[in-house]
Regions:
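Pyridoxal 5′-phosphate
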Residues: 1-447
Length: 447
């Protein structure tokens, strides 16, 4: 499948192993599975398999099933939306919150678009932290700084474990620091979708986030599902959600009354609406097996990809034109160090410039790479805070760009002499030194 091709978009999705597809196919042709909501033998078998994979997946993230639950979702965005809707409904159902229009929400500048979207449920009670220092100042002030939230207001603080744009890894100590604040009613949501691709997510620590979202296709390539991992101590924040779907209620009256009783045996029984994508969940079980067989551990993947990313970073950063000007400008946080998995993931964001310093459209770099059998990603990457920060666009300029016709799917690639997006190269577990060298040769030969 990859002969003569170089895949460098593992941040979008990593590649699935052939053995995973074969094992999954063999499973489906060898067993009869029914809808888990039915009581037949095939359905019972399917339900048991779902339960088994749920526990194994929690263990993959070092999450004790006694203290965590896992709710399957269509992707990480759906998991994030579940938290957002639940906080909105919890706030509306609480008598103590009647005076506040919405729950308070804080999010980091590096947040993916899906995290930023939560702010629309807050009635304006939200705040975007510009950098880590601002987050830490907030912690140290007990939340008073910036007058961020009312003392009685429920809050949610969300951040990505790794920027999907630059690959910079954010501090995972924040949930513990926030939880240590006396009287704090602010919960934490970790977007681990990008981080989990090449880094072990260890939820054994008491400072684990209240909510963690993941995407399995980013880790294993297949299946295309995600999950929300919930600390059971924070689970009550999701239990006031108003919507209920099939399989989440014990009884419901449709005529003459509007009463219903939700399932309360487990958090996932209450929140997984309708029939689960059980075949995809079976595939996840095989993905866990194959991943371990091929790569042994996430720590090995982390070390491998960190080494490759460091080689790639050095290669890109040293490319120059004949007049000495750099070919590429890499967008990197000063505290992030390539080769150090604690601070930097295996992702590089950059733009290419000609010999007089004019940016070459990132779309053209992507197209030329594609023609050469090299698959990367370019654009805004659903990371508006990162784009605004590194490409130095303020809010008024972003609005002006939109008025001029700029769209995420149809970008104006250069505005006022500045690129409006970036080229991103992201490595994965099966990336090789040959992949790195192929891309560097591509840049050398064409720019």
């Amino acid at each position: 499948m990859l002969k003569g091709k170089t895949y460098l978009d593992h941040g979008g999705t990593t590649l699935y192993a052939r053995s995973l597809v074969e094992k999954f196919s063999e499973d489906l042709v060898s067993n009869l599975y029914g809808n888990p909501h039915s009581a037949s033998t095939p359905s019972t078998l399917a339900g048991d398999r779902v339960d088994e994979v749920r526990i194994r997946t929690l263990q993959f993230f070092n999450a004790d099933p006694d203290h965590f639950d896992l709710i399957f979702a269509s992707n990480a965005t759906a998991a994030i939306k579940l938290v957002a809707e639940s906080f909105r409904d919890y706030h509306e159902s609480s008598e103590s919150n009647k005076r506040q229009k919405g729950f308070w929400y804080g999010y980091h500048r590096d947040a993916h678009t899906s995290l930023i979207g939560i702010r629309e449920f807050t009635h304006g009670s939200h705040f975007c932290f510009r950098d880590d220092e601002q987050v830490n100042r907030w912690f140290n002030s007990g939340g008073v700084i910036f007058r961020l939230y009312h003392a009685r207001q429920i809050g949610l603080f969300a951040f990505p474990g790794q920027s999907n744009m630059t690959g910079r890894r954010l501090p995972l100590t924040w949930p513990a620091k926030l939880r240590s604040k006396k009287g704090a009613k602010i919960y934490t949501l970790l977007d681990a979708a990008t981080l989990a691709t090449t880094c072990s997510i260890d939820l054994r620590d008491k400072g684990a986030p209240d909510f963690t979202c993941v995407s399995f296709y980013k880790i294993f390539g297949f299946p295309n599902i995600g999950a929300l991992i919930v600390r059971k101590e924070a689970g009550h924040m999701l239990q006031q959600r108003k919507y209920f779907g099939g399989g989440t209620v014990d009884i419901i009256i449709a005529l003459d009354d509007t009463w219903h009783a939700k399932k309360d045996s487990s958090l996932h029984d209450e929140l997984e609406d309708g029939t689960l994508p059980f075949h995809s969940i079976f595939a996840l079980g095989h993905a866990l097996d194959v991943h371990q067989q091929l790569f042994k551990s996430m720590s090995r993947i982390s070390a491998h990809t960190a080494y490759l990313a460091k080689r790639l970073f050095r290669g890109i950063s040293t490319l120059t034109h004949s007049n000495g000007l750099s070919v590429c400008r890499i967008y990197k946080d000063p505290e992030a160090i390539y080769g150090d998995p604690k601070t930097q993931g295996a992702t590089i964001a950059f733009n290419v410039f000609d010999s007089v310093g004019t940016p070459i459209p990132f779309t053209e770099v992507e197209k030329l790479a594609n023609i050469n059998g090299i698959y990367i990603r370019a654009g805004g990457l659903c990371n508006p805070g990162g784009v605004a920060n590194f490409l130095e666009f303020d809010a008024s300029e972003m609005r002006a760009a939109f008025a001029a016709g700029h769209r995420c799917s149809r970008p104006l690639v250069v505005m006022q002499g500045r690129a409006t997006g970036v080229v991103r190269v992201s490595l994965g577990a099966m990336s090789t030194l040959s992949d790195v060298n192929t891309f560097l040769t591509f840049l050398e030969n064409n720019y």
